[in-house]
Amino acid sequence: MKWQRLLAAGLAVMMMGLAGCGSQQQATSGSSGSGSSSVGKAIVVGLDDNFPPMGFKGEDGQITGFDIDLAKEAAKRLGREVEFKAIDWSSKEAELKSGRVDVLWNGLDITEKRKENMLFSDPYMDNRQIIFVKKGETSIKDEKSLAGKVVGTQSASTSEEYMDGNEFFKKDVKEVKKYSDFVSAFMDLENGRIDAVVGDEIVGRYYMSKHADKIDAVDVAVGPVSTFGIGFAKDNQALRDEVQKVLNDMKADGTMGKISEKWFGKNITK
């Protein structure tokens, strides 16, 4: 009977071990609820890293810009690290949905179409789409002046969305040429490969400040005025609300205004 007593004791030890493992698994799985923002985890920011002054690579190769400074300050107040990840901007919705990035924070216009695929923060800056021409060009004065012209813009931008849905650009404009980023479009404009660029005023005027002798702006809005916001995955309401709270605090205490003054010379935030 000795062997029976040993077997019973061994089984008892095994059962205790299994019970302990089950309790540990229960405790681990219960530590993160649905909709959690994973406090402590780094926030991964998806961006187009050639979109000055909102987010771009500086001369030292580091990502910098207005939105970068905002994101760093927001993460600091949340007690979290922040990681900036350059993505193909035309695939931004897929990057967000897949979880490869937590937020889209890089001069992202709030549109009804995008609201179908993501949550947005409150708007924090207005943004017009305007026309940019080569220095000395005087025949292009407004949208209708683009008839018969080759017009450049960035793929997956608000400008592209507007022109794709506008019959004038489909029928009367000679060609709408699409680029991976606005900087490439401006370079082609400088070199005479296209006649005009339709794009974000904030980005274009920043580029103009560095190339004042080559690019000019036609100070007329093309399409409706839009607003910038931060994009979040549809199922990440918790992170959206946490970030919105610190943004509200940054507005109230003047931090957002100071960051704006650093990049634009004045406070242009909403």
Spans of model-derived segments:
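Flexible hinge/capping segments at coil-to-helix
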Residues: 28-32, 37, 134-151
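Short helices/loops that flank or line small-molecule/ion binding pockets
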Residues: 76-77, 85-86, 90-103, 117-119, ...
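A ligand-binding cleft/hinge motif common to bilobed small-molecule-binding domains
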Residues: 108-116, 164-167, 188-191, 195-224
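Periplasmic-binding protein-like
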Residues: 49, 126-133, 205-248, 264-270
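Extracytoplasmic small-molecule ligand-binding "clamshell" domains
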Residues: 30-107, 242, 253
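Acidic, polar ligand-binding/catalytic clefts
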Residues: 72, 81-145, 216, 221-222
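Extended ligand-binding regions for polar small-molecule ligands
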Residues: 22-23, 68-77, 137, 150, ...
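C-terminal motif of bacterial Sec signal peptides marking the signal peptidase cleavage site
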Residues: 17-20
